[in-house]
Amino acid sequence: NFGYLTRGGYSKKINGKRTFIKKDPNQYYTYTGALVDYSQVVELKTPFRGYTAWHKYSDAQIKSLHAWILFIGERDSIDIRKGLPEWVKEKGAEGFEFNSDAYYGKVKGLLNHTNTRKDKFDMFPQQELMDMLISL
């Protein structure tokens, strides 16, 4: 999973300046310029962190993440229903956005970088991921 995708090319720093490298206008590309198969593209109805196209989490990735969350929650006595799963239940995709209480350590539970840092893109609100989080 590469995160956000761009259509028609990708941005690259050349001589210290961001430049858009044009490619096939009908294709999606990762931030490194790798072509992404259409079956691995998720188009969000509402942009997340400025992007609507994202590299899809596979069913196997979501299943593995589910098992990992359960394991870490049990091992470290973390209430995995608090934090991100709670916010996704309340606000849907907006639950993935920055949360100042999480940033300042006032929230105990399951968090991710996008909740605590405005410059991170490591998780995005794919419906299957949100469904898994709500099921916790």
Task: Pin down the residues of each PLM region.
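Basic/polar, cationic surfaces and motifs that engage anionic cell-wall
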Residues: 3-136
